[in-house]
Each structure stands twice: as structure tokens, then as C-alpha cells.
Amino acid sequence: GFGKVAMPPHNLTLTVAGAGMLWVGWFGFNAGSAVAADNSAAMAMLVTHLSASAGALAWMAMEWIRHGKPSVLGIVTGMVAGLGTITPASGSVGPAAAVVIGLTAGVVCYFATNWIKNKLKIDDSLDVFPVHGVGGILGTLLAGVFCSTQLGVFSGNGFSDGIDSIGG
């Protein structure tokens, strides 16, 4: 039954190889959204890399704190959390914000994964919802907080845009 036996992937080498391909492919996903090989595409590529790295680092730190050692699978999962969380913001944030978003993604998605598995007893074998779903929601919210000065909640016209988005 659920929760009695941990079921990690059978071949972590292939998991890491697949994660590497996913990471490289995500550059095309985020930088390709700029539809031109210009500075915005380069920035999207940079922030994608930084967020994925920070997500992996944060997840690794959480495992180290809670279990005494990190796992390869955890580092890969943190990387995917960083990638998913930066996607909504990749065209509108700078490098420092990308690191904060990635670190936040690693920590929040780590706790979301544990909560969904252990408290809700939902068997999500690839942790799809806590990593991609929670990460995407978090990224959407953080995009509004950290995006450029023309668009951001704190520096742009965020309040009136928020009112407009809810039908006001």
C-alpha cells in the first residue's frame, strides 16, 4: 500500500541523464518564447539556468537539514521545481530575482511534496503536482512580485492591473 515502501527510480543514472536533457530543452522553451535571438532571449536563458540551479541547491539543503544527507533524486527534483517556477517569469525578471525564485521553489515544492504524500496520502509517483503544479502557481505569483519596473506589483501599475484582472 501507499507509504509502506519507498519506490525510487530503478536507474538514477538514466534519471540524471534525462534531467540534463530536460534542463537543456527548457532553455529552448523559455528563451524561445522571446521569438528572437536578442537580449531578452539571452536573459530568459540565464534566469532559467540560475533558477534551476538554485532550486536544486535549496532542495538539497532541505534534505540535508531534515535527513542528514541529500539525494541525487532530490537534487534532480529541485532542479525541475526551479525550472517550472521560473517559466512564468523568465522573460521579465533579472538574475537576482531568478535565484530567489529558484530558492523559494526548492523549499516550497519540497514541503508541498512531503505534505501531499504524507498528510494527504495521495500517491503521485513522479511528484507531478507538488513540483509542477505548486511550482507553476508559485512562479505565477512571484512573477508579479519580481518582474521589471514597468510591470511589477511594487513598482509598476500592479494594483490597477490586479483590479482589472478580477473584473473591476
Residue ranges and their predicted role:
Residues 1-168:
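Glycine- and aromatic-enriched membrane alpha-helices
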